[in-house]
Structure formats: C-alpha cells, structure tokens
Amino acid sequence: MAHKKSGGSSRNGRDSAGRRLGVKKFGGEAINAGGIIVRQRGTKFWPGENVGMGKDHTLFALATGAVKFVTKRDNRTYATVVPANEVMAAE
C-alpha cells in the first residue's frame, strides 16, 4: 500500500488578467468617429479638440480624421483629432 501524505495548501496562485490598456491609435493614424484612441487608468492623456473622455478615462474620437498628440505648456499631453476635411485641405 503505497501512500503519500497530502501536501500542504498554498496561499499563492492568483493573478488577474491584463487589462489591455494603452494607446490604440498613434499620431497620424486615421480614425472614425467613436473610435478609441487611448485606454488608460487616470488621465495620462487629456482630451483635446474633437476628442471625448469616458467615465473610465478612455479617450475616443468625436469626428472622423487623423489622430494627433500635442504636449502643451501645462505639461499635459492632449490627444486631438484633425477632421478628415481639414487633413485633405492641408495636402
């Protein structure tokens, strides 16, 4: 009768899945209205022109166009969307 005493229990062994945070559309990339630009905890990036902020601080486009990141004198980085018609006019 080969027996083995039971091993002790461990208090480790739990971990939560990663939250998939970060920049989803980088500077110069095209984005549609409603598209997510940044998923973040807190305000690492702030909403600029044509960008809205959700209750979990997610930044999303309010207009179709190109994403642009701007650091202003207040030391905040703002995500802005240059509307598609303005992008065409600049070219």
UniProtKB/Swiss-Prot annotation:
GO CC terms, sorted: cytosolic large ribosomal subunit
PROSITE patterns: RIBOSOMAL_L27
Lineage top rank: taxon: Bacteria
Ranges where the record places region Disordered: 1-21
Keyword Magnesium attached: no
UniProt KW keywords: Ribonucleoprotein, Ribosomal protein
Listed SUPFAM superfamilies: Ribosomal L27 protein-like
Coiled-coil intervals: none
Pfam families the record matches: Ribosomal_L27
GO biological process, one term: translation
One GO MF term: structural constituent of ribosome
Parts of the chain that traverse the membrane: none
Similarity section: Belongs to the bacterial ribosomal protein bL27 family.
Cited HAMAP family: Ribosomal_bL27
Name of protein: Large ribosomal subunit protein bL27
